[in-house]
């Protein structure tokens, strides 16, 4: 009976260590900056790992009064690029902790 409790306590300590590592990795990821760009670098955006926009830079050549849709499309492309980079790095970083856990 005693061996079973010792194993349970050991397992709980391991889970607490892993939870601490996951929290540290998530905090580090949240502070990491990811840059997304539109074609020809006409628009650049910077997001943090927690999906907060920090910066947007628009090349003056991208501003055309007669074609506002072009600028909108460039912004969307840059944001989507940044979000893909955030998601990719998040999956890579956090995936090592969720591998083998059903539903994760």
UniProtKB/Swiss-Prot annotation:
<protein>
    <recommendedName>
        <fullName>Nucleoid-associated protein PEPE_1483</fullName>
    </recommendedName>
</protein>
<keyword id="KW-0963">Cytoplasm</keyword>
<comment type="subunit">
    <text>Homodimer.</text>
</comment>
<comment type="similarity">
    <text>Belongs to the YbaB/EbfC family.</text>
</comment>
<dbReference type="GO" id="GO:0003677">
    <property type="term" value="F:DNA binding"/>
</dbReference>
<feature type="region of interest" description="Disordered">
    <location>
        <begin position="1"/>
        <end position="35"/>
    </location>
</feature>
<dbReference type="GO" id="GO:0005829">
    <property type="term" value="C:cytosol"/>
</dbReference>
<dbReference type="InterPro" id="IPR004401">
    <property type="entry name" value="YbaB/EbfC"/>
</dbReference>
<dbReference type="InterPro" id="IPR036894">
    <property type="entry name" value="YbaB-like_sf"/>
</dbReference>
<feature type="compositionally biased region" description="Basic and acidic residues">
    <location>
        <begin position="21"/>
        <end position="30"/>
    </location>
</feature>
<dbReference type="Pfam" id="PF02575">
    <property type="entry name" value="YbaB_DNA_bd"/>
</dbReference>
<dbReference type="GO" id="GO:0043590">
    <property type="term" value="C:bacterial nucleoid"/>
</dbReference>
<feature type="compositionally biased region" description="Low complexity">
    <location>
        <begin position="8"/>
        <end position="17"/>
    </location>
</feature>
<keyword id="KW-0238">DNA-binding</keyword>
<comment type="function">
    <text>Binds to DNA and alters its conformation. May be involved in regulation of gene expression, nucleoid organization and DNA protection.</text>
</comment>
